[in-house]
Every structure is written in structure tokens, then in C-alpha cells.
Design a protein with these regions (language model features):
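A conserved helix-loop-strand patch within extracytoplasmic ligand-binding domains
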Residues: 1-29
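Small-molecule-sensing regulatory modules
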Residues: 24-171
């Protein structure tokens, strides 16, 4: 378990967001960025380059390797990246046939939550180099947005938790 890792444990993650959150929760750990696909990162773990690593459960599931996970972290403890797990499809604006086909694939609640999370990301001028997390969820006619922005070293993490009308979710 994360809480039981000894001081100085070398932890690898591919995410600046996860690194900042982890350092904020456990500044006694040695957290570093690890590059490569899931197999490469597992190889680095097996080779002793790291004592532990963070991996997306979806990636482990795709590879049939869920069994290597020793702990599944909750979004309450580690908020995901904005729009993480959502798939977006684009096409030419004047291609009415394709637009009609794609409209059947649109999931309005997912689109609404993604747009809310991305609005927060835009308001914070976020990029892949900024430790920002966001998770929007719909409850009836309301949307709740939990978010955070952190210093890269984890020394400071600012949280927000707001609820409002879905119609206002992008403002």
C-alpha cells in the first residue's frame, strides 16, 4: 500500500500530476518520471530501477495484467487528468453525412463533463507540463467539479470543489 512504503522508496510515474500529488502526500518518497509504454515501465520496475510505479488500470486491463496492481487508488485521493478516459472524435464541419453518423455516438453527459473539466484547464492556462487534475460529475441537473493545481515539487496543492447548474458548467 502507498501509505506503507518506506521512506526513500523510489517511485516512478509518467505523470507530472501524479508526481506532484504523491510528493504532497508523501514528501519522504523519491518520485521520478518514468518514460515508456506499460511494458517498458514494468520492465524498469522488474530491473530494480524503481521500487514502485503508478500505472493506469485501463492499460493493465488492456494487456491482461491487472494482477500486477497491488493497490487501486481512488479519485478522492488522486484526481485524474482533465478529460482522462474520454474519447473525442472530430470531422470536417461541412461533412453533414459524417456529422449525422457521429451524432449517434455522442454521449451528452460525457461531453458536458469533459467540457467542464477542459474549461477549468483553460482557465488555469494548463498544459501537459502543469500538474492539474479535474473530475466533473453530473447529479441530476447539477454538475460537481473537483479540481486541483499543484506545484511541480508537490509543496503546494490547491483544491476546488464546486457545484452548479449544468448549463453554467463551461463558465
Amino acid at each position: 500500500c502507498l501509505k506503507d512504503l518506506p521512506q526513500g522508496t523510489r517511485v516512478g510515474t509518467a505523470s507530472l500530476r501524479r508526481k506532484a500529488i504523491l510528493l504532497n502526500k508523501r514528501p519522504d518518497l523519491d518520485v521520478d518520471i518514468i518514460r515508456g509504454n506499460v511494458q517498458t515501465r514494468l520492465g524498469k520496475l522488474a530491473a530494480g530501477e524503481f521500487d514502485a510505479t503508478f500505472l493506469a488500470l485501463a492499460g493493465l486491463d488492456r494487456l491482461g495484467q491487472r494482477d500486477v496492481a497491488t493497490e487501486i487508488l481512488s479519485p478522492e485521493d488522486f484526481l485524474p487528468a482533465c478529460a482522462q478516459g474520454a474519447v473525442g472524435i472530430t470531422c470536417r464541419a461541412d461533412d453533414e453525412r459524417t456529422l449525422a453518423f457521429l451524432s449517434a455516438l455522442d454521449d451528452a453527459p460525457t461531453r458536458q463533463t469533459v467540457m467542464c473539466e477542459r474549461a477549468m484547464l483553460d482557465a488555469l492556462d494548463g498544459s501537459c507540463q502543469t500538474p492539474i487534475a479535474g473530475l466533473a460529475e453530473i447529479y441530476g441537473d447539477q454538475m460537481r467539479l473537483r479540481g486541483l493545481i499543484a506545484r511541480l515539487d508537490g509543496s503546494e496543492v490547491l483544491h476546488t470543489d464546486v457545484t452548479g447548474a449544468i448549463a453554467d458548467a463551461e463558465t
